[in-house]
């Protein structure tokens, strides 16, 4: 069942807090399928994993593209705690995610 954008964004904020508590920069992302189910979550991992591209959005995009087809991802929505940087925006674009939300309204 689909929840409000606020629900998903608040969960993304919680993921960012978890990333910070783990020693990373506080960013989070999650992927929601067309039925409204959260199917993937990711916090930043660039510090603890020593991966310079370990931003939440890019890492989630890479994981999602390995696990799901482009057609499936087209109907998914990415929620993030901030507007993606250029690297992450490119990764999201190549993953063929239909949309992303970054703001509470």
Question: Which sequence ranges carry the predicted segments?
Answer:
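Short beta-strand scaffold segments in enzyme catalytic cores
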Residues: 27-32
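A short, polar/charged loop-to-alpha-helix boundary motif
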Residues: 48-58
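Immediate flanking context of iron-sulfur cluster ligation sites
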Residues: 72-82
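Short, basic/aromatic recognition patches
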Residues: 2-21
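Conserved small/polar residues in nucleotide/adenosyl-binding loops
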Residues: 95-104
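Short beta->alpha transition motifs characteristic of CBS
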Residues: 39-46
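Local cysteine-cluster metal-coordination motifs and their immediate loop/turn environment
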Residues: 81-94
């Amino acid at each position: 069942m689909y929840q409000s954008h606020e629900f998903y964004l608040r969960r993304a904020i919680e993921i960012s807090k978890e990333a910070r508590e783990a020693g990373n920069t506080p960013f989070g992302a999650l992927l929601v399928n067309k039925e409204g189910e959260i199917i993937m979550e990711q916090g930043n991992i660039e510090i603890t994993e020593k991966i310079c591209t370990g931003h939440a959005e890019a890492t989630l995009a890479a994981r999602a593209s390995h696990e799901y087809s482009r057609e499936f991802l087209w109907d998914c929505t990415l929620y993030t705690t901030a507007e993606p940087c250029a690297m992450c925006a490119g990764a999201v674009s190549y993953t063929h995610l239909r949309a992303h939300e970054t703001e509470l309204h």
